[in-house]
Amino acid sequence: TYVVYNGKGGTDGRGYETWIAESDNLLEWRTLGRVLSYRDGKWDCNQRGGFPALPDMEWGGSYELQTYKGRHWMTYIGGEGTGYEAVKAPLYVGLAWTKGDISTAHEWESMDKPILSIHDKDAQWWEKLTQYKSTVYWDKDKTLGAPFVMYYNAGGRHPETDLKGERVGIALSK
């Protein structure tokens, strides 16, 4: 998959969508179509930049995307703000899935609300401005106590200095 921004600069354009393309040589690509399109009237109406989840992370393994409960999964940055990374509005982390063939273009299903938000009661200062890219791994050994580990980065303002900072966070899911 790849993410498409439809503007030329940081504030023009609507935002991100996620498309799929294929290549035989990594130099020449054929666009196949969208997998996360704009959704008018939803929390993520202008931003839907996706990142496929559950790759096989075994060293020397297949690196193929694994299924869970018969579905492929993808997290994405979503929001209603327009422009590059919605500079005037927060981004949140959404979740999408499909039971279909991930090598063909088709719209993936999405949740009606984000799975990670600046409004979450346990959000720390560095998560309260916006949230960015996320990646989910399936740790079948539950090294951190849960099988699903999401790494994500987020931004916020320090409560004492008011300086903007970004951090990488870890979220766990059972």
Predicted regions and their residues:
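Carbohydrate-active catalytic/glycan-binding domains of CAZyme proteins
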Residues: T1-K174
